[in-house]
């Protein structure tokens, strides 16, 4: 498959599934998870802060770290890649499904999930917290009103609404993603190294059932040898190339 054939396949497809990773948000200035360790936090490994054990050991420290990341995310804006995926959803309607490994909420802010298709945040959302007792999810207060640790409306302490090291992805989110990729005529895999499972296995669901997988990533990944077509571009530029004739 070449670029013109990839464009034609995407244009003709009624069912499109998309997986995005950190690469698409890097263009909005969001550091990757491991790049985020600077300043005071440089002496910590991400695993030392983003795990159930870390939270049990020192919830205040974990919340201090997440509060900084929360402020960074709120200061960022969706980029052209986010906007193009929202536009693709508007074109495809209910046949469009987007699963993201990112926790920054930028896809939703760009309009994804509100134009007839579905958005699933596989790893949670930095802009939310959940009640430790009930599991109910609430939006975080504005940074200048945020107290740590935040409390739910019923006074229970809340934890970040994030899937931590050692935790499983939410079953309903993963099931929805697997169904969407299994039924997709075309799957786009954008800005991810394709090494973190189970998300990295989603493209195989599409290939197994005869669908096409189009990868967009600046460097080759573990998926590249199996992808139907692979673009060595940034997320935004790759999407522009795929959609420019529409």
From Swiss-Prot:
The organism's place on the tree of life at top rank: Bacteria
Compartment list: Cytoplasm
Signal peptide bounds: none
Annotated substrate binding sites: 66, 69
Deacetylase sirtuin-type domain segment(s): 1-246
Transmembrane segments: none
Enzyme class, spelled out: transferase
Keyword annotations of the record: Cytoplasm, NAD, Transferase
Catalytic activities: N(6)-acetyl-L-lysyl-[protein] + NAD(+) + H2O = 2''-O-acetyl-ADP-D-ribose + nicotinamide + L-lysyl-[protein]; N(6)-succinyl-L-lysyl-[protein] + NAD(+) + H2O = 2''-O-succinyl-ADP-D-ribose + nicotinamide + L-lysyl-[protein]
Record's keyword annotation contains Nucleus: no
The EC number(s) this enzyme carries: 2.3.1.286
Residue numbers binding NAD(+): 21-41, 101-104, 191-193, 217-219, 235
Family stated for the protein in its record: Belongs to the sirtuin family. Class III subfamily.
Known role: NAD-dependent lysine deacetylase and desuccinylase that specifically removes acetyl and succinyl groups on target proteins. Modulates the activities of several proteins which are inactive in their acylated form.
Protein name: NAD-dependent protein deacylase
Native source species: Deinococcus radiodurans (strain ATCC 13939 / DSM 20539 / JCM 16871 / CCUG 27074 / LMG 4051 / NBRC 15346 / NCIMB 9279 / VKM B-1422 / R1)
């Amino acid at each position: 498959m070449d670029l013109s054939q990839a464009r034609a396949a995407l244009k003709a497809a009624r069912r499109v599934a998309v997986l995005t990773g950190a690469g698409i948000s890097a263009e909005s200035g969001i550091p990757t998870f491991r790049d985020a360790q600077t300043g005071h936090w440089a002496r910590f490994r991400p695993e030392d802060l983003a795990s159930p054990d870390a939270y049990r050991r020192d919830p205040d420290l974990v919340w201090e770290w997440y509060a900084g990341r929360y402020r960074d995310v709120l200061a960022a804006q969706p980029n052209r890649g986010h906007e193009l995926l929202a536009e693709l959803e508007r074109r495809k309607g209910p046949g469009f499904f987007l699963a993201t490994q990112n926790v920054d909420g930028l896809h939703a802010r760009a309009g994804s999930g509100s134009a007839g298709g579905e958005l699933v945040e596989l790893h949670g959302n930095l802009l939310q917290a959940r009640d430790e007792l009930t599991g109910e999810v609430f939006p975080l207060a504005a940074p200048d009103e945020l107290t740590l640790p935040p409390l739910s409306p019923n006074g229970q302490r809340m934890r970040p609404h994030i899937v931590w090291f050692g935790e499983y992805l939410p079953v309903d989110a993963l099931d929805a993603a697997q169904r969407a990729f299994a039924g997709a005529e075309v799957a786009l895999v954008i800005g991810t190294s394709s090494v973190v499972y189970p998300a990295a296995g989603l493209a195989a669901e599409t290939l197994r059932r005869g669908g096409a997988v189009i990868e967009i990533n600046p460097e080759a990944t573990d998926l590249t040898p199996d992808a139907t077509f692979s673009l060595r571009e940034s997320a935004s530029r790759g999407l522009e190339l795929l959609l420019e004739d529409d």
